[in-house]
Every structure is written in C-alpha cells, then in structure tokens.
Amino acid sequence: GLNRLTAFTHGAGRYTEKVTGYDKNGNILSLQCYGQTSASVYGLITLTGNLLNRVDDTATTSAYNNGFEFKDGVKQANEYNYDSNGNLTKDLNKGITNISYNCLNLPSVVTFSDGSTITYTYGADGTKLRTVHKIGSTTTTTDYCGNVIYENGTQKLLLTEEGYINLAGTQQYHYYLKDY
C-alpha cells in the first residue's frame, strides 16, 4: 500500500528480484535475486535485511573463461552468520567456520573447516602489522613494516607509489598503470 517495490524483472526474464516484505521503517526484510547463469540455469541469492544469508548457484560452467566466480559449497538455509555489529562471522561457502574481531571491528582470527587459521595483528590505529597463516604444519608469517613486506623474516616486497619491487630471488619491478 505504500508504493513499495515487491518484484522486478529485467532482460526478458533473465534477472528477477522478489521483495518478501518491509519493516515499519520501509527497510527490506528479505530479498531474493534470481539471475540466469547460462542458457537455462538460474541462481538464487537470499538476503535478510541488508545481510546475505544464503546463495544457491546452480551454474556448472563459468560465464567467462577463467573468471573469478562464486563457488556454492553448501546447501543450507543460513550459510552466513553475523555479529551484533554486522561483521561476518561465518561463511560456509568458503569453509570459514569462525571470524573473530578486535575492538576496532577488524578481523583478528579467521578459522577454516580444515583447521587452518589466519591471525591478524594491528597497531592501535588499525594499521595491519602482521598476518600469520597456519595450514596444517606449515606457518607463514608476513610482517608489514612501512613500505617493506617481510615473509618469514626475509624481505619480500618493497612498495612504492609507482608499483612494487619483488625482492625474493631476482629483483622484479612491477608498475601500476595509472590513467588519472
């Protein structure tokens, strides 16, 4: 009755959205997005408010060769969890079983279903100082010291405004393309 959008179809039915309800302030309570991923296959994204809680991707091939794409790892009603600040705490499609956050709402530990972890250390201003990846019995520590990045105590990269220099092995220069 308040002229709110409840359904949307675009591209000859290749993409549709369905709003399943609004709260008293006019915020969307749930949104389902259907998109055609190939000639006859569709996917489904389900949101609760502005938080994603489920993605069903039925595509078996990539829309683009070697494209970065979503991998539908599980089929559950609630594939994502959030804390009271809206931070993602679980992503079952990526195998993330828990993400804990520090007092600045920055991720401090990410735990995966295979037992692997990523631990982050920050300065008081939120600057990332260290990342520790533990995969099985292998631990890789990356330290961020100004414009120099160290991996397991050895200089790896030197960052500059123009790009970066790979310091491991033979030095290689990589330049950023700036078109502004």
How would you describe each model-predicted region?
Residues 1-174:
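Acidic/glycine-rich beta-solenoid
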Residues 179-180:
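P-loop NTPase catalytic cores that bind/hydrolyze ATP
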